[in-house]
């Protein structure tokens, strides 16, 4: 880690001045590999050990056939192959399928998933049968991907970027990424308060001990020991989303064959002086005896009999005891293997629960980072795949039951194989999950949501693409909560979750991003984990098997949710120190977390909590004692003494040092120039706007088949940038333009953040962009083919002989796009262009297929030119956003004495309230960099109050012959006279955002209306009405424009004519009754009559909004009569 960090640059340099600029690197950069690390590593973990663990823990499927045979089925192993062309497809150059093939063919990048099903009849094992369950999507650059171990050079050869880090799925041609979600820390007993728990039953309180128990196959369940107001406790477990509650001492008696006295001694051990707790333990033991169950066997039979109906997994020929064993094994503390370990953990949970209930220790917060971990894509994929395989086995059983209906029907290998084929597969379900992000789960998989789990990996620009891989979401459930607790950034998130990079609005504080050096732990070497208990005993830990009296001043010791023993308070720090030594020097797992919580009055429950499992957030710091890098976790960081700066270290107190001051920020926050000189919201805005910038999303343009891509034609490298910009090689995907900016209120067009662009700069390509759109044309019928109509000579100038447009030709709305021969009706058909904007044909590709009956498929990529227009949005890297309000002729703009004319005129009123000092520094630094032909470092925290940035860059300007303060005298472009003010003048890196007026403008005269309200429909594409909201209404009211208000909201909206009765004030009672047809065939009617009054003289016509009429009608349906008060005019 340290050597890799030493290889990183410390100051930025001009990229194209380096000799290695054009060379493909030998290996992927550490920073770039870290982006996809958690995704790829978790998927690889699933492929190597995860699927084997899933098969090992799958519940066998037992049933009794009509012939009396006891049939049992269990999956023995699951494996996933690399993507390959099917064997029955011939004439292929290579059998391997690569991601770029899937993208261009608009198919999924998938490999075959296979299982081995073991089965037995009456206990006699039969030969296992292998079966393919369909193709499942493969993660890019994982071990199942054909580019898994490819070098950057090989990646380029196969149409990928040399800096591709993987972590995505290609689903039907689109790139998808599984969201990382924040979950409760696994296998850690947490004391929690939840008001909803009071509604779980009589006497239930809001206090409980929660354990999110996760097994090695990533199966996840919640177990809770609830504190009851009568001084007892109940144990909660769930099965298929259904909760069950059992007295906790009944569970203890089922787990171990101990007497009541022994259970009592275990529960009160160390707390004999706590009279309240002792009396509660006695009450809980009496509660079990009140059910008339006394022995271990009686308790097991009692529980088994009670829950048998809920657990059909246990065959009917097995006794009630086996039902209890199934519950204890599969639903109670599933991360522990032995009943003894489960017993000890529940005992500890009871002890901690009653201590917290008495207020001796603090209740913990699951919204705090120390009690959280991350749901990784590989783990979610593994859980869902396992559940689908279990469902498939159940379907095999159902097929067998349909076939074996007679008493003489026996199960044979042929029958079993036939039923396995008929049972379907898992490929479609997994692909559907990754395409939609929705999970259809029977058990819930331990998740709080079943939608929004997968998002599109939008490649608007490099920053947007990068941010997806470090994004970490709290969960969609919390977006609907009114409380802000889940959104708060707590101090223990320091170094793990970026405080800057979170969106504003609904997802604020819920959608966060991991910091630059934060890593997610993976499964460690099992040998190193097994060595930990022995190390602890050697260091002085008293194991639980040691039955001697334990005093109160002892720390509990936990390893991955397993209670190992106790250590003396006096030896705790020495043991923690030795554990750190083992972690740093490799005798113990490198990602081991040593969560030591010392004794503190009214503090957190003390103990030594060691975690080695996967999915934890870890980060590197410098260990001052051992002079090495050490990885620390969220729980252990709270009680460590870490200095940010070497100057802040205290001798014999500070134990660790931060590796760099900028490591607490995310990748995108580290790209902001000098964020320490900005007001904090501006840095948040830049993180969002950086992701909306038009730039260079990719380099493999000829092989791109994305639906929509934005491209800035002439991007430039920033002259003032943080060193992280170079470390992640952002110059390869440049975004933004270096503009000469004059800060002056020169015209009336630059008010309210608007900016003026030099028309001459615009004409020379300033911020010129394009949109690339790809259309897929498919002919399903075999007899159809692309061809130009031979008898339509007017098509010659538009289409080639193959019926497709010429590359480079210009297309407009209504012009022929392609022509094909329809074999079914034996005619040529011309399809016309439906895009409203003019565009140019960039490329045309004929696409193949891996199907046995290939379809004729063509991909046409169109380029839509988008030069900067009035109304387009721009922003600097300091969060100063604004729209282009005018393209001003260069002759009318002010100029310097050297003849320099600004590209952008920025209004000075944008600085004071926003306090973006970094943009002022950038103006000076960019000017200095342009003068000296250099790049200046914008990494934060490099300057101080003694060595100020403004002084440094001011002297640089002086050295170049310019004013120290960055100002210049300008001459008016109107009359040529010198302006009497000093104008701030320099170079700023400006970003062109993707919000363009061409995509937003909307106009409507008449058109479609909603059937229900008769108001204009919404939607720009559907020709809907212009949006007129509350703010527009308020503006017209305050302006006194009453007629305009009536015009917009009434005459041009939903005006309707209706009858009203002056007497009763009803609009529903008047009736225009049709009587009969007259001689001419028309309808004649009586005068309008009010059905309530029976009078026809007081009925007249009025104009009202139709939406109001609809409201009156709806109110009448619930017996509310709306009456009008009418006045004669």
Swiss-Prot record:
Where found in the cell?
Nucleus, Nucleolus
Inactivation phenotype: RNAi-mediated knockdown results in decreased cell size likely as a result of its role in the synthesis of ribosomal RNA precursors.
Q: Which GO terms describe its cellular component?
A: mitochondrion; RNA polymerase I complex
Q: Name one GO biological process term.
A: transcription by RNA polymerase I
Predominant cellular place of this UniProt entry's protein = nucleus
Task: Please give the organism.
Answer: Drosophila melanogaster
As one GO molecular function, the record gives:
DNA binding
Q: How does it assemble?
A: Component of the RNA polymerase I (Pol I) complex consisting of at least 13 subunits.
Family (UniProt): Belongs to the RNA polymerase beta chain family.
The record's Pfam families line, in alphabetical order, gives: RNA_pol_Rpa2_4 (PF06883), RNA_pol_Rpb2_1 (PF04563), RNA_pol_Rpb2_2 (PF04561), RNA_pol_Rpb2_3 (PF04565), RNA_pol_Rpb2_6 (PF00562), RNA_pol_Rpb2_7 (PF04560)
User: What does the record give as the reaction this protein catalyses?
Assistant: RNA(n) + a ribonucleoside 5'-triphosphate = RNA(n+1) + diphosphate
Protein task: DNA-dependent RNA polymerase catalyzes the transcription of DNA into RNA using the four ribonucleoside triphosphates as substrates. Second largest core component of RNA polymerase I which synthesizes ribosomal RNA precursors. Proposed to contribute to the polymerase catalytic activity and forms the polymerase active center together with the largest subunit. Pol I is composed of mobile elements and RPA2 is part of the core element with the central large cleft and probably a clamp element that moves to open and close the cleft.
Enumerate the residue ranges forming zinc fingers (C4-type): 1061-1093
Keyword entries, A-Z: DNA-directed RNA polymerase, Metal-binding, Nucleotidyltransferase, Nucleus, Transcription, Transferase, Zinc, Zinc-finger
> Which superkingdom?
Eukaryota
Listed name of the protein: DNA-directed RNA polymerase I subunit RPA2
Answer yes or no on keyword Flavoprotein: no
Q: Which residues form the signal peptide?
A: none
| UniProt-listed Enzyme Commission number(s) | 2.7.7.6
């Amino acid at each position: 880690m340290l050597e890799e960090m030493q290889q990183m640059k410390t100051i930025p340099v001009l990229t194209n001045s380096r000799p290695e600029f054009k060379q493909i690197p030998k290996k992927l950069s550490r920073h770039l590999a870290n982006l996809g690390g958690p995704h790829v590593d978790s998927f690889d973990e699933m492929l190597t050990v995860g699927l084997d663990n899933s098969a090992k823990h799958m519940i066998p499927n037992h049933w009794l056939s009509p012939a009396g045979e006891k049939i049992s089925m269990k999956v023995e192993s699951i494996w996933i192959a690399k993507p390959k062309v099917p064997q029955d497809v011939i004439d292929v150059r290579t059998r391997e399928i690569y991601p770029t093939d899937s993208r261009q063919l608009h198919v999924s990048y998938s490999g075959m998933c296979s299982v081995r099903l073991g089965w037995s009849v009456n206990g006699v094992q039969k030969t296992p049968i292998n079966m393919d369950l369909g193709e499942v999507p493969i993660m890019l650059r994982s071990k199942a991907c054909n580019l898994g171990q490819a070098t950057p050079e090989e990646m380029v050869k196969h149409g990928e970027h040399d800096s591709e880090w993987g972590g995505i799925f290609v689903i039907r041609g689109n790139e998808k990424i599984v969201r990382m979600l924040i979950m409760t820390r696994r296998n850690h007993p947490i004391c929690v308060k939840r008001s909803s728990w009071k509604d779980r039953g009589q006497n239930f309180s809001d206090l409980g001990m929660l354990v999110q128990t996760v097994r090695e196959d990533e199966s996840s369940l919640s177990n809770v020991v609830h504190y009851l107001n009568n001084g007892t406790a109940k144990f909660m477990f769930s099965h298929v989303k259904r909760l069950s509650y059992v007295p906790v001492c009944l569970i203890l008696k089922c787990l171990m064959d101990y007497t009541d006295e022994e259970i009592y001694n275990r529960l009160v051990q160390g707390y004999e002086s706590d009279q309240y707790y002792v009396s509660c333990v006695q009450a809980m033991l009496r509660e079990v005896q009140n059910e008339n169950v006394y022995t271990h066997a009686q308790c097991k039979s009692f529980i088994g009999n009670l829950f048998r109906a809920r657990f059909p997994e246990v065959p009917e020929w097995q006794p009630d005891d086996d039902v209890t064993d199934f519950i204890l094994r599969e639903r109670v503390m599933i991360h522990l293997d032995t009943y003894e370990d489960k017993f000890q953990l529940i005992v500890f949970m009871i002890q901690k629960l009653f201590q917290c209930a008495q207020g001796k220790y603090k209740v913990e917060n699951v919204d705090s980072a120390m009690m959280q971990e991350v749901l990784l894509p590989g783990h979610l994929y593994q859980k869902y795949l396992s559940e689908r395989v279990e469902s498939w086995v159940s379907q095999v059983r159902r097929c067998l039951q349909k076939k074996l209906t007679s008493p003489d029907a026996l199960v044979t290998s042929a029958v079993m194989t036939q039923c396995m084929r008929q049972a379907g597969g898992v490929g479609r379900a997994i692909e559907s999950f990754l395409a939609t992000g929705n999970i259809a789960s029977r058990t819930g998989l331990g998740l709080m949501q079943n939608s929004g789990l997968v998002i599109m990996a939008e490649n608007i620009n490099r920053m947007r693409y990068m941010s997806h891989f470090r994004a970490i979401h709290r969960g969609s459930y919390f977006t609907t909560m009114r409380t802000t607790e889940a959104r708060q950034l707590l101090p223990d998130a320091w170094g793990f979750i970026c405080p800057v990079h979170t969106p504003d609005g609904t997802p604020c504080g819920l959608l966060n991003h991991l910091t630059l050096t934060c890593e997610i732990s993976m499964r460690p070497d099992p040998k190193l984990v097994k060595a930990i208990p022995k190390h602890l005993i050697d260091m002085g830990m008293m194991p639980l098997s040691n039955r001697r009296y334990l005093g109160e001043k002892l720390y509990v010791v936990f390893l991955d949710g397993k209670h190992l023993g106790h250590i003396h308070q006096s030896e705790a720090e020495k043991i923690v120190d030795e554990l750190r030594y083992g972690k740093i020097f490799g005798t113990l797992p490198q990602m081991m977390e040593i969560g030591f919580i010392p004794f503190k009055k009214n503090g957190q429950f003390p103990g030594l909590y060691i975690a080695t499992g996967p999915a934890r957030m870890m980060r590197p710091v410098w260990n001052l004692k051992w002079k090495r890098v050490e990885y620390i976790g969220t729980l252990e960081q709270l009680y460590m003494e870490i200095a940010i700066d070497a100057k802040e270290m205290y001798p014999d107190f500070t134990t660790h040092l931060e590796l760099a001051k900028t490591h607490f920020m995310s990748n995108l926050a580290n790209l902001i120039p000098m964020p320490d000189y900005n007001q904090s919201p501006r840095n948040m805005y830049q993180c969002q706007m950086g992701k909306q910038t038009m730039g260079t999303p990719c380099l493999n343009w000829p092989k791109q088949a994305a639906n929509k891509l934005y491209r800035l034609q002439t991007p430039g490298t920033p002259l003032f940038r943080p060193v992280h910009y170079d470390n992640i090689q952002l110059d390869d995907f440049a975004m933004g333009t270096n503009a000469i900016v004059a800060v002056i209120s020169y015209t009336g067009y630059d008010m309210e953040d608007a900016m003026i662009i030099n028309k001459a700069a615009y004409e020379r390509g300033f911020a010129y962009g394009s949109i690339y759109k790809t259309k897929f044309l498919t002919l399903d019928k075999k007899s159809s083919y692309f061809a130009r109509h031979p008898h339509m000579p007017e098509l010659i100038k538009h289409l080639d002989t193959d019926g497709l447009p010429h590359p480079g030709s210009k297309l407009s709305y209504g012009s022929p796009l392609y022509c094909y021969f329809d074999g079914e009706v034996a005619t040529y058909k011309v399809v016309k262009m439906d895009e409203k904007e003019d565009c140019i044909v960039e490329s045309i590709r004929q696409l193949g297929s891996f199907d046995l009956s290939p379809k004729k498929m063509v991909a046409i990529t169109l380029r839509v030119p988008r030069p900067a227009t009035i109304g387009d949005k721009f922003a600097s890297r300091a969060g100063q956003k604004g729209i282009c309000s005018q393209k001003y002729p260069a002759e009318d703009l002010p100029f310097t004495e050297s003849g320099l004319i600004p590209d952008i005129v920025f209004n000075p009123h944008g600085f004071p309230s926003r306090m973006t000092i970094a943009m002022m520094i950038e103006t000076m630094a960019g000017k200095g960099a342009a003068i000296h032909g250099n790049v200046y470092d914008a990494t934060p925290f490099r300057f101080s109050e003694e060595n100020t940035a403004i002084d440094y860059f001011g002297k640089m300007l002086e050295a170049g012959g310019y004013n120290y303060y960055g100002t210049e005298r300008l001459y008016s472009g109107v009359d040529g006279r010198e302006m009497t003010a000093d104008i701030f003048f320099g170079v700023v890196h400006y970003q062109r955002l993707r919000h363009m007026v061409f995509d937003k403008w909307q106009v409507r005269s008449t058109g479609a209306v909603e059937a229900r309200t008769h108001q204009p429909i919404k939607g720009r594409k559907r020709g809907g009405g212009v949006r007129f909201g509350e703010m527009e209404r308020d503006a017209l009211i305050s302006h006194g424009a009453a007629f305009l208000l009536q015009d917009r909201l009434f005459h041009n909206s939903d005006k309707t004519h209706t009858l009203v009765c002056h007497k009763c004030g009803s609009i529903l009672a008047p009736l225009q009754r049709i009587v009969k047809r007259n001689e001419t065939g028309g309808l004649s009617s009586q005068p309008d009559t009010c059905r309530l009054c029976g009078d026809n003289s007081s009925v007249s016509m009025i104009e009202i909004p139709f939406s109001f009429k609809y409201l009156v009608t709806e109110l009448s349906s619930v017996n509310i009569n709306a009456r009008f008060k009418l006045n004669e005019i």
